[in-house]
Structure formats: structure tokens, C-alpha cells
Curated annotation (Swiss-Prot):
Name of the encoding gene: recJ
Alphabetical keyword list: Exonuclease, Hydrolase, Nuclease
Role: Single-stranded-DNA-specific exonuclease. Required for many types of recombinational events, although the stringency of the requirement for RecJ appears to vary with the type of recombinational event monitored and the other recombination gene products which are available.
Organism: Escherichia coli (strain K12)
GO biological process entries: DNA recombination; DNA repair; response to X-ray
Listed GO MF terms: nucleic acid binding; single-stranded DNA 5'-3' DNA exonuclease activity
A Pfam family annotated for this UniProt entry: DHH
The protein's name: Single-stranded-DNA-specific exonuclease RecJ
Amino acid sequence: MKQQIQLRRREVDETADLPAELPPLLRRLYASRGVRSAQELERSVKGMLPWQQLSGVEKAVEILYNAFREGTRIIVVGDFDADGATSTALSVLAMRSLGCSNIDYLVPNRFEDGYGLSPEVVDQAHARGAQLIVTVDNGISSHAGVEHARSLGIPVIVTDHHLPGDTLPAAEAIINPNLRDCNFPSKSLAGVGVAFYLMLALRTFLRDQGWFDERNIAIPNLAELLDLVALGTVADVVPLDANNRILTWQGMSRIRAGKCRPGIKALLEVANRDAQKLAASDLGFALGPRLNAAGRLDDMSVGVALLLCDNIGEARVLANELDALNQTRKEIEQGMQIEALTLCEKLERSRDTLPGGLAMYHPEWHQGVVGILASRIKERFHRPVIAFAPAGDGTLKGSGRSIQGLHMRDALERLDTLYPGMMLKFGGHAMAAGLSLEEDKFKLFQQRFGELVTEWLDPSLLQGEVVSDGPLSPAEMTMEVAQLLRDAGPWGQMFPEPLFDGHFRLLQQRLVGERHLKVMVEPVGGGPLLDGIAFNVDTALWPDNGVREVQLAYKLDINEFRGNRSLQIIIDNIWPI
């Protein structure tokens, strides 16, 4: 199946009230991304939403305060992705700095324990002497685990950002901006953001109770942990709304200034990234995957240990271990992609077209990599995808990724209502979800999922498209504008990096590496000569020496090599004219 990609230009909100002193290009870019006022461009900590609007915080901090006073053993239970790892490390570091000495953490193993606070994970925490469990980036659907903890006399504080179901676990306190009765304006906090807000509230409560004065403890500067917040927020691909942009920008600023955890510094080194020139995309595409590799292939306790360690030498050893795991992950993923594309071809041949929603399974797929695989196939065919791998007990674990127009968790909830028992469990967000089912139910699920997507999704949404910010004038194709755009972020999910389009003469073209197209182009109407590169092109189509003019969708970029800086364009899409 050849996915046709259409170009659409982003609409600009002409009613946005943005500062007149902003360059016209930035005003256009911000207005087309839903920014309506200067307040939404605030990047200082003063602009952060107050923690007081998070429901459940007051009860949670009282429980934690009493635990601190009584020396209660606290176990932080995290998750096996980058958000879970940063949430766990942040919570442990923050509570230690606040004066808690009896604290430990536990991260479930993806392959042995599965996701969340299960009864088995509670037993592990109990074996470690847990007297209070605090979940981070999980717990909102852990009814059985919370009940089991209560039966053992262990209270639970749930901090999470995943969407809640119709009923909530019977925890002593629940903090989640997506609770129905929570008035926190941002529903897009990552798990690490929720954990950070709880620690801010706890610090205030402890200060008001005289905790620090009684013990002659300096009140900690929790802003020192914003590097972890930035990494977890970007890596979890939550929308970068105004509040998340503040958290991310502040964390990135600390990393750029060299004021970050040794583990983050070591990850930057193995990823060959310059901290001083850090972009949000480096967190998402360089650091995040290496941290995630621990949870995907091995055990995320390695990742948490990296983020907790204070010694750069130890951090470098752990970062190299994660880098090697990430390389293995890439190799596994490459093989799985080939198999997935073969499955798509067979499916298309059997019915002349691909279904609106793809559910895929291969008995040799790796359950730690199916989420990435679903993302890759979704990007290729522009439709919701759920990829499954065997869980080893007659069940399958699936990871889904969606497109705009289909809320993945809502779709799974509807399937669960229509076909009770088809799935064992599920959870997630609008754009990503996880589920498990018995292996003999896969064919039924594949059929029902495809039917539901066809029913719910407008067929036009299955047409892949590139959304552009329109053309740049030749005068805007400069290093100064490229730097302006770099500094105008952070860019990310739901606040995309500026992408422009234009008509160019194709002056030179050649392959570099195996699949990257290096070009030199010139605007058809006149303008500067531009070096450009398009990654992972279809080598059956490019290079094509018969093509003289092209339409490009591209990003302005600064190429830095051996101390030299030059303007280049990163080409997302290229169409011959």
C-alpha cells in the first residue's frame, strides 16, 4: 500500500492577542498553535499553575507528613518507562532532601510483574518492609493492588496522570489531574509532573508545620529536579500545553547550564549531544529512548539507578549499559518492522485495502518493543495500530497508537462494553493505550477493532497529511531566523516544531549513508542556495535525476560541524513537480 501524503497549511487564529514586539513570524506560529495571549508564552516558574488546584494533594501531604514524623517506611512504586523512571527518581530525591530517611523504591518488571501496582508488586513492597506505598505514573486502575495493600495494613497514595475508569481504587489519597472532580486547569501533566507538584505541596506543608526549623534542615530548592521533569514530560509525549512548556523550558535551562543530574549528563554524552545546545527533541529522540530501553528489554531499575546516582563515573557506566540496550532494541525493532510490513501486505491482498484499524500479532515479537512498532506502522499507514506480543502464559500484551480523530482508550472501553471478556484489561490515553487478552481471542479482537475504527473514524482522517506553517520568504531563510525558532520553543507534542513548505529548484541530489538524500535547492522565485537532507527516503524513488523542481515540507536548522555553523533544511517530505 502506497500511503498518499497531502499537504495542508495550518490555520492562523487572527483574534490572538499577542505582543506587538514579537517578530511577525513568531506571532503567526504561536497563533496557529492556539496561543492567544502573552501569558501563555510565559516560561518562568512564576507562570506555573499552583499546586493548590490539584485535588487530593492536601490529604496526601498530611499522610506523608505523619509518615515522616513517625519514621514510616515509604516505598515509591514506579513504572517501567521514562516517565515512570523520572517520577520515581524525583520522588525519592525530593523526599530525601525534605528529611525522609526511610524511603526506597520499586519498579515492576515488565516481563515478570506487568504494569502497575498489582497484588504481586504489593507483596514485593511488603517484603521490603513497606508501611506506606506511593505510586508514581501508575495506580489509577490498580483496584486489586490497592485492596491487597489495605488487607496487609499498608496505606496507598496514588499519583498518576492516566485516564481513570468509572470507579477509583480505594486508596487513602489520589492525585490525578484527570479526575472528574479535579479543577487543575492542565490535564496534560506527565506522571513526573504530578509527582513534582506533590513534592512542592509537601515542602510547603512541612515548612508551615515547622519541620525544617525543628530539625535545622535547609529548605530544599526543588527546582533542582526540573531536569527530571523535563525529560519525563517530553519522553512521555504528553501535550506541551502552556504549563508543560514552563516545566520543560525550566528543566532544559538547567541542563544547558550544566546544573543537571549526573545521569542526564552521562546520557547526553553517550548520545553525542551538546548540553549547551539542547533542544526538546534531544530529550524525546536521544535521551528518552535510551532510558526506555532499560524497561523495554531488561529492568528499569537500571534507569532509576542512573538518575539517582551522584557520581559521574558510575553514571557513565550505567549510561553505556543503557546505550547498548538501546542498540539491541533498534535491531529487534528493525526485524519486527519487516515482519509487520509483510503482515500488512498479506492483509491488504486478502481484502484489497487495509482496514481502518490495524491489530497485528507475531509469536516471536518482543513485548517490550511492540509500542514502538505500533508507532512506526501508524506513521507509515496513518491509521490506529495495536501490536501484540506473547506474554508467555497463553495471553498477549498489546500496545496501541492512534491518530487524531480516534481516542484509543475510549475505543477499547467501547469494545469492552460491547464484548465483555474479550480483553483481560486495558488502559491508557487518547493517543496510546495498552491491553492484554487471551491468545485465542486475537482474531476476534482484530475483527472487532477494525470494525469499530471503521464505524467511528471519518475515512478522510486515514489520509496522511503534512501540516505546514506555509512558506518562508527568501529573507526569512537565514541563520538568524533558524536561531530564533530554536529559542522560541520548547516544541513538542501538540505544539509542533515549525514546518514550512515551498517550491524549489533541485540543483543537486545524492544518497548519503544507505537511505538519506542530500540535496542543494534554490527557491523558484529566487533566494539563497540551501543545503538540505531528507532522512530515510524511498530509494526506489530517490535520487531521481529527471526531477528538476520539487515541493518541500521542511524545517530550518543550523548544522554545526567541527566548530562551523551553517544553515540547512531538514526535509520531512519531498514531492516531484
